[in-house]
Swiss-Prot record:
Annotated protein name in UniProt: Aspartyl/glutamyl-tRNA(Asn/Gln) amidotransferase subunit B
NCBIfam families named among the record's database cross-references: gatB (TIGR00133), PRK05477.1-2 (NF004012), PRK05477.1-4 (NF004014)
Family indicated by similarity: Belongs to the GatB/GatE family. GatB subfamily.
Source domain of life: Bacteria
Organism: Fusobacterium nucleatum subsp. nucleatum (strain ATCC 25586 / DSM 15643 / BCRC 10681 / CIP 101130 / JCM 8532 / KCTC 2640 / LMG 13131 / VPI 4355)
Reactions that this protein is recorded to catalyse: L-glutamyl-tRNA(Gln) + L-glutamine + ATP + H2O = L-glutaminyl-tRNA(Gln) + L-glutamate + ADP + phosphate + H(+); L-aspartyl-tRNA(Asn) + L-glutamine + ATP + H2O = L-asparaginyl-tRNA(Asn) + L-glutamate + ADP + phosphate + 2 H(+)
GO MF annotations in UniProt: asparaginyl-tRNA synthase (glutamine-hydrolyzing) activity; ATP binding; glutaminyl-tRNA synthase (glutamine-hydrolyzing) activity
Role played: Allows the formation of correctly charged Asn-tRNA(Asn) or Gln-tRNA(Gln) through the transamidation of misacylated Asp-tRNA(Asn) or Glu-tRNA(Gln) in organisms which lack either or both of asparaginyl-tRNA or glutaminyl-tRNA synthetases. The reaction takes place in the presence of glutamine and ATP through an activated phospho-Asp-tRNA(Asn) or phospho-Glu-tRNA(Gln).
Subunit structure: Heterotrimer of A, B and C subunits.
PROSITE patterns with a match to the protein in the record: GATB (PS01234)
EC number: 6.3.5.-
Keywords: ATP-binding, Ligase, Nucleotide-binding, Protein biosynthesis
Single biological process term from Gene Ontology: translation
Keyword Transmembrane helix: no
Length: 481
């Protein structure tokens, strides 16, 4: 009998909080855009006798994350030392929350491509500190302690995911939720979001989980999905061939698309956790939580409803425009300047997203400002240019930041709306295309629009795209009655 297998997946996500300063001291939390080892002090370097002091902003941001992820926030929690010896840990321990974290029992929900709704539990969120950044050369390694003690929250999911698609969508949803709170850049590219996957397999229907393997070195959401798929296959094959899965930590090898053994997995006892003696218990009052609730930014779900109601967008368009908070902000700025929500939505969903996809960039690196895109839309609104010419102006504006009105005048792209001039062109086309005229007159009501479109196209060709298409259309229909 062939056994069927089921995978069990849990994710641990580390997020850097953009508080401006580190978690235990006043050093700047900037480690990539400045010189090496500039933002350090005796506290974040772990000098003997240097005492940590908890940054209040870290707690506020951590509470925002917990609220956004539907967590229960504990009024009292504490800090613990996780002891281990590694070059990037200057104190030879990490301050974290092991015994009791500040938030627990949360969840997030999302829909898969199939339409199935999935709810993933969040075991807990804990406040901790980052390590120094190791930079590896050919024959040596360097340590940048600018990153040491940058504030982190670790979001630990329940082992509720059953395949790589669910894990991928969990990460996407988590990223969007946190981005809306503006507490973190949530970027794997810059390291402000890091993810480890815990993966095991069991016989389908079993209530006993298999041996868990942790996979690290995952540098994109797609890498997470690929590593999960590989590891599930590896574990099933190993068991079916009579072997057993060892509890271990493995690294994802992106080049070869496999996981490799890094070390045997440590148990909690290996880290000799004990309460942090240099910090008081973390006390969060209900009043503090309520104050932060009032300061919470609009959620994506609330924004979708507002976009539908205020801008008359359908569900699909509102969903796409709110997928990234920066894109939704860009859309609202374009609407503010153009006063035309429908055209703004259409241009962003087609032309802007086309460029973002082609260049593989996000809206923050898009070269046309919201004000300039709005000006292009207003030129269409005022019939100064046609939609076709607007696309030409758009392409020019990608590399030219000047006012679109200046570009239109300089390139001679102003739309022709002089009826007498357009009429001459219409007459010329009708005189030279008798077959199309006859075809239009003999066509049934279903074919007439297609034939008309062809005649309009001929007029637009003569005018080099400048003739007002509405006037062209009206004149042709009048003459072909």
């Amino acid at each position: 009998m062939i056994k069927e297998w089921e995978s069990v997946i849990g994710l641990e996500v580390h997020l850097q909080l953009k508080t401006g300063t580190k978690v235990w001291c006043g050093c700047k939390s900037d480690y990539d855009e400045s010189g090496i080892n500039l933002h350090t002090c005796p506290i974040c370097l772990g000098h003997p006798g240097a005492l940590p002091k908890l940054n209040k902003k870290v707690v506020d941001y951590a509470i925002k994350a917990a609220l956004a992820l539907n967590c229960q926030i504990n009024n009292e929690s504490g800090f613990d030392r996780k002891n281990y010896f590694y070059p990037d840990a200057p104190k030879n321990y990490q301050i974290t929350q092991f015994e009791k974290s500040y938030a627990e029992k949360g969840y997030l929900e999302f829909k898969l491509n199939s339409g199935r709704q999935v709810k993933i539990g969040i075991t807990k969120i804990q406040i901790e500190e980052d390590t120094a950044k190791a930079v590896h050369g050919k024959n040596e390694s360097y340590l940048n302690f600018n990153r040491a003690s940058i504030p982190l929250i670790e979001i630990i999911s329940e082992p509720d995911m059953r395949n790589s698609e669910e894990a991928y969508e969990y990460l996407n949803t988590l990223k969007n939720i946190i981005k809306y709170t503006k507490i973190s850049d949530v970027s794997m590219e810059t390291g402000s979001l890091r993810c480890d996957a815990n993966i095991s397999v069991m016989e389908k229907g079993s209530k006993v989980f298999g041996t868990r393997v942790e996979v690290k070195n995952l540098n994109s959401f797609k890498a997470v999905a690929r590593a999960i798929d590989y590891e599930i296959g590896r574990q099933i094959e190993l068991i079916q061939n009579g072997g057993k899965v060892d509890q271990e930590t493995r690294l994802w090898d992106e080049e070869n698309q496999i996981t490799r053994v890094m070390r045997s997995k440590e148990e909690a006892m290996d880290y000799r956790y004990f309460n942090e003696p240099d910090l008081l218990k973390l006390v969060i009052s209900d009043e503090e939580i309520e104050e932060i609730k009032k300061d919470m930014p609009e959620t994506r779900l609330a924004k979708i409803e507002r976009f539908k109601n205020n801008y008359s967008l359908d569900e699909k368009d509102a969903f796409i425009l709110t997928e990234e908070v920066e894109l939704s902000d860009y859309f609202e700025e374009v609407v503010k300047y153009s006063n035309n929500a429908k055209l703004s939505s259409n241009w962003i969903l087609t032309e802007v997203l086309r460029i973002l996809k082609h260049k593989n960039i996000d809206i923050e690196k898009f070269t046309i400002s919201s004000e300039n895109l709005a000006k292009i839309i207003k030129l269409i609104d005022k019939n100064t240019i046609s939609s076709k010419i607007a696309k030409e102006v758009f392409e020019i504006a990608l590399d030219d930041s000047r006012d679109p009105e200046i570009i239109v005048k300089e390139k001679g792209l102003v739309q022709l709306s002089d009826t007498s001039e357009i009429e001459k062109m219409v007459d010329e086309v009708l005189a030279n295309n008798q077959k199309m005229v006859d075809d239009y007159k003999s066509a049934d009501e279903g074919r007439k629009p297609r034939v008309l479109k062809g005649i309009v196209g001929q007029v637009m060709k003569i005018s080099k795209g400048k003739a007002n298409p509405e006037i062209v259309n009206d004149l042709i229909m009048e003459k072909l009655k």
